[in-house]
Amino acid sequence: MRSKKLWISLLFALTLIFTMAFSNMSAQAAGKSSTEKKYIVGFKQTMSAMSSAKKKDVISEKGGKVQKQFKYVNAAAATLDEKAVKELKKDPSVAYVEEDHIAHEYAQSVPYGISQIKAPALHSQGYTGSNVKVAVIDSGIDSSHPDLNVRGGASFVPSETNPYQDGSSHGTHVAGTIAALNNSIGVLGVAPSASLYAVKVLDSTGSGQYSWIINGIEWAISNNMDVINMSLGGPTGSTALKTVVDKAVSSGIVVAAAAGNEGSSGSTSTVGYPAKYPSTIAVGAVNSSNQRASFSSVGSELDVMAPGVSIQSTLPGGTYGAYNGTSMATPHVAGAAALILSKHPTWTNAQVRDRLESTATYLGNSFYYGKGLINVQAAAQ
């Protein structure tokens, strides 16, 4: 009897110990997951020949989880806890570990802007953007809209895999300004014959990880886009994002990016990223009277201005509406680049950019207006 009681006591004690240990392990696991964040881990150029498996091992050995390895950037998107971040920063093969920041669409809320930048002058000459491919790196495009001709695309938003569904309406609006069809309905885009590609990197709330944007730019490079429109941005720089933007430009793509909607703050630049990078054309917004919109970001990085107040364009569901923002100004520049390339298909992206900037109409202090309002008629001469 005593032996039986002893056995029961031992069994109870073991059960209690196991339960406590399991609870402690669960608590540790919960504690670990709560501190995990999304990062981009960059590897040193001397390690460029390192295999994908080896790079994954470097991160995994530190407790990280690799989400995606990039094609043109020697880096990987990963989920890491604080300990893994510290250990990776010490690893001799790692160049940097940076947070995978979140970018947001730059919008606040007829196309008078089409006339304001002199696009109809090129239309009348027969140049409408034919044979020019424009990647709209945004929230997707409603491909069923009767005023849009979407030729292809891809989604890099894990939870929203259809690039032709636009939950925020932002990308569809941007697409219409670039290339709404000349079909007697709705609105007219800057380059109505340009080929639109929906590259989805923002979710239905208008937000997206930098790693999603990097994937989108890499897709544009691999698919030989001529123009990239990025009506998005964030307040924080990223080595990986700059690397892929620079790669896009060195690949011959014209890259237009929204300067941001942060307004002015004395002599401090409020231009966001990726527009802040020198390789992009940073676009600010003016109204129909060529006055800088109060929300338009300012700074020495600002390159040109375009209409961005009460811009009427396409919306999901076959509808239309007016939005404000440097997001709305940027597609005027992307569309203008498409018009120029349709007239001068042998021009390089550097030539297109130089013409857009050198022929812009002076509006005032470059800190607030860059080179001025684009004039695509003059730029295409």
UniProtKB/Swiss-Prot annotation:
Per the UniProt entry, how does temperature affect activity? Optimum temperature is 37-40 degrees Celsius, loses activity at 50 degrees Celsius.
The enzyme's main class, written as a single word, is hydrolase
Q: Which Gene3D superfamilies match?
A: Peptidase S8 propeptide/proteinase inhibitor I9 (3.30.70.80), Peptidase S8/S53 domain (3.40.50.200)
Q: Where is the Peptidase S8 domain?
A: 111-380
Q: Which UniProt keywords apply?
A: Calcium, Hydrolase, Metal-binding, Protease, Secreted, Serine protease, Signal, Sporulation, Zymogen
Q: How does it assemble?
A: Monomer.
**Which reactions fall under this protein's catalytic activity?**
Hydrolysis of proteins with broad specificity for peptide bonds, and a preference for a large uncharged residue in P1. Hydrolyzes peptide amides
Q: Which GO terms describe its cellular component?
A: extracellular region
Q: Where is the Inhibitor I9 domain?
A: 38-103
Q: Which GO terms describe its molecular function?
A: metal ion binding; serine-type endopeptidase activity
Protein name as it appears in the record = Subtilisin NAT
Superkingdom as given in the UniProt entry:
Bacteria
The gene that this protein is the product of is aprN
Locate the residues binding Ca(2+) 2: 275, 277, 280, 303
Q: How is its activity regulated?
A: Inhibited by PMSF (phenylmethylsulfonyl fluoride).
Q: Which organism is it from?
A: Bacillus subtilis subsp. natto
